[in-house]
Amino acid sequence: MKYLLIALVRGYQYAISPFLGRSCRYVPTCSEYMVDAVQKHGAFRGGWLGVKRVCRCHPWHPGGYDPVP
């Protein structure tokens, strides 16, 4: 499950993200954060942390440096 999630995010990074341009307000980007969170915490908790991060990534949030806990 862990490797499937990472593969899906990597697929997004290489196939879709280049056409959308840089729009993430955070460092590391939301997709990098998702991969790091899944590697560090596993599929379920890491996936949940990644989803929460994507929900916080919008124009009205200041963004900035936000590492995986």
UniProtKB/Swiss-Prot annotation:
Indicate where this protein is primarily found.
Answer: membrane
The protein's topology relative to the membrane is: Peripheral membrane protein
Has keyword Transit peptide?
no
Report the subcellular localization: Cell inner membrane
Report one GO cellular component.
plasma membrane
- Record-linked InterPro entries: Membr_insert_effic_factor_YidD (IPR002696)
Q: Which Pfam families match?
A: YidD (PF01809)
For this UniProt record, give its keywords in alphabetical order, as a comma-separated list. Cell inner membrane, Cell membrane, Membrane
Please name the NCBIfam families in this protein's record: membrane protein insertion efficiency factor YidD (TIGR00278)
- Briefly state the protein's biological role: Could be involved in insertion of integral membrane proteins into the membrane.
Q: Which family does it belong to?
A: Belongs to the UPF0161 family.
Stored PANTHER family: MEMBRANE PROTEIN INSERTION EFFICIENCY FACTOR-RELATED (PTHR33383:SF1)
| Listed name of the protein | Putative membrane protein insertion efficiency factor
